[in-house]
Curated annotation (Swiss-Prot):
Disruption phenotype: Abolishes completely the formation of aspirochlorine and leads to the accumulation of dechloroaspirochlorine. It comes from the Eukaryota. The keyword NAD does not apply. Disulfide bonds: none annotated. Its EC number is 1.14.14.-. GO terms for molecular function: FAD binding; flavin-dependent halogenase activity; monooxygenase activity. This is Flavin-dependent halogenase aclH. Chloride binds at residues 328-329. Pathway: Mycotoxin biosynthesis. It is an enzyme of class 1 (oxidoreductase). It comes from Aspergillus oryzae (strain ATCC 42149 / RIB 40). The keyword Acyltransferase does not apply.
Amino acid sequence: MSIPNRCTVLVVGGGPAGSYAAAALAREGVDTVLLEADVFPRYHIGESMLPSIRHFLRFIDLDSKFDSYGFVNKNGAAFKLNSKPEAYTDFIAAGGPGSHAWNVVRSEADHLMFKHAGENGAQVFDGVKVNSIEFEQIDGLTVDPSLSELGRPVSATWSCKATGGKGSITFEYLIDATGRAGLVSTKYMKNRRYNQGLKNVASWGYWSNAGSYGVGTPREGDPYFEAIEDGSGWVWLIPLHNGTTSIGVVMNQEAATAKKRETGATTKDLYLNTIKNTPGVWQLLDKAELQSDLKSASDWSYNASSYASPYLRIVGDAGCFIDPFFSSGVHLALASGLSAALTIRAAQRGDCDEQAAVSWHSKKVAEGYTRFLLVVMSALKQISDREKPVLTDFDEDSFNRAFDFFRPIIQGTADVDKNLTQAEIAQTIEFCVQAFQTASTDEQDAVMTKVAAINSQNGTEGALRELHASLSADERRTLTTIQARQIIRSEDQMNIDNFTIDVIDGMVPRLERSSLGLARFVPKAQTSREDGLRATLGLPEKQKSIFSY
């Protein structure tokens, strides 16, 4: 099969975001071509998945292939952020049997996704690099004023190193899934920006004969994450099905540079010394041996001012990336890939015009990035326990949008009109840090029982007063923990429910085979008094979190 001269949608990049978008579009009958520069299977970091991945994969009928492949099942994850006992997120307790995720070898998992796109009708080619994009000016369509001169993409040039072949392909839509290279963001839009508060460097390698966290318990084989004792970063330990264990060190770049300078250590010296001084990880390595060369990466966190323009969608790491702390990379990749596919279909089907589709996708990607950024910032603040300017480079519009969900709970008011201040951002992070505090299931059940028992006739404000008057100091702390866990939307890690109910510009996704697109949002009927109180407190209608509530 040869690369065609024309297609409806060209997807550049065959990682999770690109392969997912290509599969979703091809299943809708869209003429889709997927070009990947590397030859599969190809290496990639990011082995630990979130349970939400299963639900994204199920939408394109790919979950059963992951289940049968032999990857290590991930029933949860352990996080030791400070001197207190590690916290454990239990996927099975929250979602029931079959709610596990996986620890994957990315070269194999990504290849599964790439092949699946082809099996579902996309024309897929690896070893083919896209070198340039040609744009044409269009009138009357722009969302981001800074991109008004870009125009719409109409063709791409490609080359194949193995054969020496070269060519070009024209298209109606382009999806940029080129990973950290970010072809469109860095070469054409030139709108990528790094978060200076998350200037980290990571080094990692693969060990043989490493021990496992939780041996003899249902937690055996789950990833283990531990903070470095001086607060400069953290270490991951992820068992893989090929018999190796991925162990990585993520450290603030300034701290890593200072430690090397003070001790004369090499990158490998710093890596090994850090692991030796991380007790929980080191005790699992008494018989282990580092069997690979170290790999390194820096500048983990970046985003952009826009993730779409007319007839163009940017997905996955090509647009933004945070930090591997909560395994958010593949989650955000698949979410953005699905967003790209459904907004293209929405415009094609007439659900909305192209400008509205562009706006929806860009806001959806920005919101997902911002929510996970808040989670990571809260966790890193818990690790470092010191003031750091972690959100100096945030996207104000998207953070304002995400903060709309947080401010009423933190301030006890529904006022969401004013712009954010740095103090409010700090307050948000401080509040969300409470999500990492311990609260037993019994303690949470007791508090939620009291929430359900409130039957005030004085409206929501009266119900809030009655509730807080009925709670002890310890119960109020437990309530704060429950609220914080809902603010950081921990259920996003379990399923894709929130993907289908998030209202952006008055529209919600329609995730139906053969009808993929956007639909106008229709508000629900009046809620009950208890539901209203739960909503005001930021508590869930039903138990669906990786935490107890």
